[in-house]
Every structure is written in structure tokens, then in C-alpha cells.
């Protein structure tokens, strides 16, 4: 297996773990105000289990929903919840460029998470698409600003993640074009989730090497 194939496999594996931070982390955060120790224990246990068995959290939630006979569009629900900041991904360096990176990523994720509310109103959805395009450009501009100002030993990892983000941005654009032909919103939701995931990975990569 080549290095690129290994990275792609790792990305795909972590994608199924979106449920952990999009669905369960907010639950743990709420629990902290009631029982801090229990919340920390549960968070650590879920993180460990998810790391060893990627997708486990999603499987558990799907089984619970199935047992309770709750019918929801999980892909859509995940997208609605995926805009929140995730501490593990947020860059904690104080320099303006890094804080800008956090803010640009947050802005893009928030716009993407609104797609389910906008998609059935053509005028509003077209404006949302324009906002997403602007947010993507602003995020990439900020990434380039960081590249210019700071030198990294592990620049290849950063360049790779930037290319992955651009690739998924183009894929999202292609999905939108197809949607206007076939009307299948679920494909737009899934593509938006992947783009949010890539946005988080950009933050994670910078946080790791910064």
C-alpha cells in the first residue's frame, strides 16, 4: 500500500467517527454540568473504543434508534449537528493567523450545516451555495497565509490535507450540479458531511504540526 493510499484509508476510517464528536460530544458537554467525573469517564471510554473500532459510536446510535423504532434521516441529522467546534481539532496557538483559521473553518461548517433548512427553497439555497463558495475561498486563503508566514518540517502533510480539501470541495460542487438534475438531496447532505470532515482534518493537521 502506498503512502497516499494509507492516508486515504485513514481519512475514510476517521470519517465514520464523525458521529462521536458531532452527536456524543455535545451530550458529554451537557453531562459535565451534572456529573463532571462521569462525563470525563464516558468521553474517554468512547474515544478509546472509537479509536480501536472506527464507526462503533455510529453503530451503537443506529441500533438504539432501530430498537426504539425511531425513523430519521441520519445523514441529514449528522449534517445539522456537525457545525459545533470540536476541542480536539481547534488550534490553540494565539497568533492571529491560526485564530483566523479556526474562525474560517467554523464559518464554513456553520453554512454547510444549514443546507437541510435551505435546500427546498431554491432562491435561498442558491444564496447558500454562493456563501459556501466564498467560505471555501476564505479558508484556503487563510491556509495559504499561514503557509507564507510559518515554516513547517512536516509541510508535506499540510499540503496533502489542503489537496484533499480542494478535492472534496470540487466533489461537493459536482454533487450540487447533479442535484439540480436528479433532486436527490441525500447526496448533497453526504457530500457536505465529507467537506465538514475535511475542514476538521485541516485544523487537526495544523494543530498536530504547529
From Swiss-Prot:
<dbReference type="GO" id="GO:0090443">
    <property type="term" value="C:FAR/SIN/STRIPAK complex"/>
</dbReference>
<keyword id="KW-0037">Angiogenesis</keyword>
<protein>
    <recommendedName>
        <fullName>Programmed cell death protein 10-A</fullName>
    </recommendedName>
</protein>
<keyword id="KW-1003">Cell membrane</keyword>
<dbReference type="GO" id="GO:0006915">
    <property type="term" value="P:apoptotic process"/>
</dbReference>
<dbReference type="GO" id="GO:0001525">
    <property type="term" value="P:angiogenesis"/>
</dbReference>
<dbReference type="GO" id="GO:0007507">
    <property type="term" value="P:heart development"/>
</dbReference>
<dbReference type="InterPro" id="IPR009652">
    <property type="entry name" value="PDCD10"/>
</dbReference>
<keyword id="KW-0333">Golgi apparatus</keyword>
<keyword id="KW-0053">Apoptosis</keyword>
<dbReference type="GO" id="GO:0048514">
    <property type="term" value="P:blood vessel morphogenesis"/>
</dbReference>
<dbReference type="Pfam" id="PF06840">
    <property type="entry name" value="PDC10_C"/>
</dbReference>
<dbReference type="GO" id="GO:0090168">
    <property type="term" value="P:Golgi reassembly"/>
</dbReference>
<keyword id="KW-0472">Membrane</keyword>
<dbReference type="InterPro" id="IPR048288">
    <property type="entry name" value="PDCD10_N"/>
</dbReference>
<dbReference type="GO" id="GO:0001944">
    <property type="term" value="P:vasculature development"/>
</dbReference>
<comment type="subunit">
    <text>Interacts (via C-terminus) with CCM2. Interacts (via N-terminus) with STK25 and STK26.</text>
</comment>
<comment type="similarity">
    <text>Belongs to the PDCD10 family.</text>
</comment>
<dbReference type="GO" id="GO:0005886">
    <property type="term" value="C:plasma membrane"/>
</dbReference>
<dbReference type="GO" id="GO:0043009">
    <property type="term" value="P:chordate embryonic development"/>
</dbReference>
<dbReference type="GO" id="GO:0019901">
    <property type="term" value="F:protein kinase binding"/>
</dbReference>
<dbReference type="InterPro" id="IPR046409">
    <property type="entry name" value="PDC10_dimerisation_sf"/>
</dbReference>
<dbReference type="GO" id="GO:0001568">
    <property type="term" value="P:blood vessel development"/>
</dbReference>
<dbReference type="GO" id="GO:0000139">
    <property type="term" value="C:Golgi membrane"/>
</dbReference>
<keyword id="KW-0963">Cytoplasm</keyword>
<dbReference type="GO" id="GO:0003007">
    <property type="term" value="P:heart morphogenesis"/>
</dbReference>
<dbReference type="Pfam" id="PF20929">
    <property type="entry name" value="PDCD10_N"/>
</dbReference>
<comment type="function">
    <text>Promotes cell proliferation. Modulates apoptotic pathways. Increases mitogen-activated protein kinase activity. Important for cell migration, and for normal structure and assembly of the Golgi complex. Important for KDR/VEGFR2 signaling. Required for normal angiogenesis, vasculogenesis and hematopoiesis during embryonic development. Required for normal cardiovascular development. Promotes cell proliferation. Modulates apoptotic pathways. Increases mitogen-activated protein kinase activity and STK26 activity.</text>
</comment>
Amino acid at each position: 500500500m502506498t503512502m497516499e493510499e494509507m492516508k486515504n484509508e485513514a481519512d475514510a476510517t476517521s470519517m465514520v467517527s464523525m458521529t462521536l464528536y458531532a452527536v456524543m460530544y455535545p451530550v458529554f458537554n451537557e453531562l459535565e454540568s451534572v456529573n463532571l467525573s462521569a462525563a470525563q469517564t464516558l468521553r474517554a471510554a468512547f474515544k478509546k473504543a472509537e479509536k480501536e473500532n472506527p464507526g462503533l459510536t455510529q453503530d451503537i446510535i443506529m441500533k438504539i434508534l432501530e430498537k426504539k423504532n425511531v425513523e430519521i434521516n441520519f445523514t441529514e441529522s449528522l449534517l445539522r449537528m456537525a457545525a459545533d467546534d470540536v476541542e480536539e481539532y481547534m488550534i490553540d496557538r494565539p497568533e492571529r493567523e491560526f485564530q483566523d483559521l479556526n474562525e474560517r473553518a467554523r464559518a464554513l461548517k456553520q453554512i454547510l450545516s444549514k443546507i437541510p433548512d435551505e435546500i427546498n427553497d431554491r432562491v435561498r439555497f442558491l444564496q447558500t451555495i454562493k456563501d459556501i463558495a466564498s467560505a471555501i475561498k476564505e479558508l484556503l486563503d487563510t491556509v495559504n497565509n499561514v503557509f507564507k508566514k510559518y515554516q513547517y518540517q512536516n509541510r508535506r502533510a499540510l499540503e496533502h490535507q489542503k489537496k484533499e480539501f480542494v478535492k472534496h470541495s470540487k466533489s461537493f460542487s459536482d454533487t450540487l450540479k447533479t442535484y439540480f438534475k436528479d433532486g436527490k438531496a441525500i447526496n448533497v447532505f453526504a457530500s457536505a458531511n465529507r467537506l465538514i470532515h475535511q475542514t476538521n482534518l485541516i485544523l487537526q493537521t495544523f494543530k498536530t504540526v504547529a
